[in-house]
């Protein structure tokens, strides 16, 4: 079946954030940000007392419900940048008894997906997080989805497999993250990414991070954010 039409989302919803700002380190202390005590305690337990620029720059527009586009390289702290506001919103909305995931995170590689899963779990262990990727038995991932998750993190190919098998339902997704979007293009995931995006409810908040902005990434930004 051809993909359903997807109207362009208003650019006013988007916030473009840099990964650096030269901020005063004292102002970057976690106590200066509108984070819950649960999150602050979890960060401090991990030895995180201050936020990186990308994390601070993403937080305000994200908590306002805006879509976020970030020019960010690997190693800038962007995983915590998108996960903090999403976790805060999920904590505010309370525990979900729904088994369907509320947040989907797309990564170009298994290694990055596993790294992001670890980061999210370390921040708030109570969040139900599942990482899915190819090359391993899909049955275990299907069982975990049936038990219920809040975050599903994975590579586009395996996510498509799970969608086609009816194991992954996206109709409850409230938050979508595309990480290292330019690398999605480099490894040939552009069709899978767009197919997944078209399955997600339009009433969602979207985060896109990319070190560079090739034409496809710009088009995805205009179409889905």
PLM features: what roles do these ranges have?
Residues 14-18:
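Short, low-complexity intrinsically disordered segments enriched in A/P/G/S/L with frequent Arg
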Residues 19-20, 24:
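Intrinsic-disorder-associated, low-complexity terminal segments enriched in Asp/Asn/His/Tyr and depleted
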Residues 26-71:
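Conserved pre-motif I regulatory segment
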Residues 41, 96-164, 172-175, 218-219:
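Conserved nucleic-acid-binding Ia/Ib motif block in the N-terminal RecA-like helicase ATPase lobe
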Residues 43, 55, 70, 86, ...:
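Residue-level signature of catalytic and energy-coupling elements of molecular machines
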Residues 59-64, 80-97, 121-122:
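Walker A/P-loop NTP-binding motif
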Residues 72-76:
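The conserved Walker
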Residues 169-178, 182-225:
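Post-DEXD/H (motif II) to motif III coupling segment of the RecA-like Helicase ATP-binding lobe
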């Amino acid at each position: 079946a051809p993909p359903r039409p997807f109207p362009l989302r208003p650019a006013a919803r988007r916030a473009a954030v840099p990964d650096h700002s030269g901020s005063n380190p004292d102002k970057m202390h976690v106590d200066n940000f509108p984070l819950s005590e649960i999150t602050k305690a979890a960060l401090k337990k991990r030895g995180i007392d201050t936020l990186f620029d990308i994390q601070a720059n993403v937080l305000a527009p994200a908590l306002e419900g805006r879509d976020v586009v970030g020019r960010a390289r690997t190693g800038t702290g962007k995983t915590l940048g998108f996960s903090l506001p999403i976790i805060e919103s999920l904590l505010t909305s309370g525990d979900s008894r729904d088994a369907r995931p509320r947040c989907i995170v797309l990564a170009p590689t298994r290694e990055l997906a596993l790294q992001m899963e670890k980061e999210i779990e370390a921040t708030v262990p109570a969040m139900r997080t599942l990482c899915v990727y190819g090359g391993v038995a899909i049955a275990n991932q299907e069982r975990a989805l049936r038990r219920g998750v809040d975050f599903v993190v994975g590579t586009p190919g395996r996510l498509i497999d799970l969608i086609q098998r009816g194991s992954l339902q996206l109709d409850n997704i409230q938050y979508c993250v595309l990480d290292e979007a330019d690398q999605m293009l480099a490894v040939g995931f552009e069709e899978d990414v767009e197919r997944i995006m078209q399955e997600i409810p339009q009433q969602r908040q979207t985060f896109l991070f990319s070190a560079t902005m090739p034409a496809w990434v710009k088009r995805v930004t205009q179409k889905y954010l």
